[in-house]
Structure formats: C-alpha cells, structure tokens
C-alpha cells in the first residue's frame, strides 16, 4: 500500500512470492477541503490488530481510517469503509504516524505546526490524549518519528530552523510524553532510524550529504554525537533490513 503525496492518492499493489510488485488492484483519490487546500497523503500504516489501515493527509489535516479485508480474494479490493478517524487542528499538517510497542497508543508528528500528538487506539477508534510542541525551532518542517526498541523513548526530527532531534520519555501506562532533551544535527534531518540493538541513532542529513551517527543512552534516551558519518548524496530515508 503506497501513499502518494503529490497526487493525493493511495495505491494498493499485489506482491508475488519473491516480494516483487505486481499489478495495482486498488486506487483511491482524495479531494481537497477547498480549492486552495489539496490532498497530500503522506503516510499509510496498518493498525496493530491488522484490521484497519490509517492514512495521514497533510493537506486536509485528517487521519483517515480504512477497513482492511485480509480475506479478500486475490486481486480484489482490500480497503473499504473510508472514515475520518481524527481531525487534526487546522494548519498542523499531519505527516508520520507510529504505534507504541503494545499497540495501545499512536504517536503523530505534524509537519507544519511542529506538534507531537499522543492518540489512544482501541478497536479501530483513536482519541487524543496529549498534544505538545516538539519542534523547538518552530520552522514548519517536522519530519520523522520513531520509538526506541525497548519502547521507552520517542524521537522526532525537525528541519528548516534549529535542525535536530527532540527526545521524549514515554509513560508506559498512560502513553504520555515528557520532553527530556533536544539534539542538534546536520542540515535538514529528513529521516532517521534507530539500530535494532538500540545503541545508535542514524540521521539522514539531506543537505549535508551525510548520514550522521549518534550514540544513544538506553537509560536516559539522550544522544551523543560520535563525530562519525557516512557520506551519501542527498540521503532521504534509512531502513534496516530484517
């Protein structure tokens, strides 16, 4: 399932046994709320129970929910029952969404407004629990969001002003966040990834042409610049293979 930002649409493709893309079996186009506000679908993510798929629409300030039909015959429609699951505050621009390790909470980073929103999740329904400012520079360029492998800390990246990573401790019972630090990075940290062992956090600094390596303190969640980096032309995404 792909989110297409510029077109404001979703594509669903079949995969063969080797994981190669096959035919597109479903196409869903979104309309803008007004002629000036066009749809920009930025992220698609399945819910932990596997029953739904959520989509963030940065242009319309919506999170949409689709029912996912796992039993659909091969080649038939799999996403149905489109609904607005959460209305984001106007102008916030929802970008990326991630679920907690236990699946009870979702965390949203808003690109334009710079807020991080904590949402509870239960049987296809999401409700707002907490909102707090994550972008210290308030540059309108918040980008990525990830949770540490142990589920104790959440990180968000921010561009355009005071480029860096916000660090939050996660309350294990309530899912709420507490700010514990902010780590400056190279220019335009569009994306980042935490190593599977949780020891390092790698930042794709697009306009510095490098992947910056930070050591992560498992106890405090804070980051330390190792002064090591990997030279890459305009890096935009880091994913660890499983």
In which residue ranges do the predicted regions lie?
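Asp-box/WD-like beta-propeller blade repeats and closely related beta-sheet repeat scaffolds
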Residues: 1-45
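Conserved beta-strand positions in repeat-built beta-propeller and related beta-rich domains
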Residues: 2-5, 55-58, 100, 108-112, ...
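Short loop/turn segments immediately following beta-strands, especially the blade-tip
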Residues: 13-22, 67-77, 119-126, 168-175, ...
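Beta-propeller fold detector
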Residues: 22-30, 75-86, 127-134, 177-184, ...
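Beta-rich, blade/repeat-based domains predominating
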Residues: 31-50, 87-105, 135-150, 185-200, ...
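Loop-centered beta-sheet repeat module
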Residues: 52-113
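Loop/turn-rich, solvent-exposed surfaces of beta-rich toroidal or solenoidal domains
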Residues: 140-174, 178-206
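Blade-level signature of beta-propeller repeat domains, shared across WD40, Kelch, NHL, RCC1
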Residues: 206-215, 224-242
């Amino acid at each position: 399932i792909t989110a297409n930002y510029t077109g404001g649409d979703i594509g669903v493709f079949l995969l063969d046994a080797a994981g190669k893309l096959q035919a597109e079996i479903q196409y869903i186009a979104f309309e803008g709320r007004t002629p000036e506000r066009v749809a920009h679908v930025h992220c698609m993510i399945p819910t932990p129970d596997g029953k739904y798929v959520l989509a963030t629409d940065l242009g319309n300030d919506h999170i949409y929910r689709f029912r996912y039909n796992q039993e659909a015959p091969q080649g038939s429609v799999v996403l149905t029952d489109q609904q607005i699951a959460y209305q984001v505050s106007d102008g916030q621009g929802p970008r990326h969404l991630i679920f907690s390790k236990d699946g009870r909470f979702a965390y949203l980073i808003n690109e334009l407004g710079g807020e991080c929103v904590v949402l509870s999740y239960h049987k296809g329904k999401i409700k707002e629990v907490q909102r707090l400012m994550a972008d210290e520079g308030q540059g309108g360029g918040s980008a990525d969001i990830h949770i540490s492998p142990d589920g104790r800390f959440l990180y968000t990246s921010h561009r355009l002003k005071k480029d860096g990573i916000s660090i939050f401790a996660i309350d294990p019972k309530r899912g709420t966040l507490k700010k514990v630090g902010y780590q400056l990075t190279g220019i335009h940290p569009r994306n980042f990834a935490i190593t599977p062992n949780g020891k390092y956090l790698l930042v794709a600094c697009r306009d510095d042409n490098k992947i910056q390596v930070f050591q992560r303190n498992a106890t405090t969640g804070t980051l330390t610049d190792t002064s090591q980096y990997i030279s890459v032309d305009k890096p935009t995404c880091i994913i660890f293979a499983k």
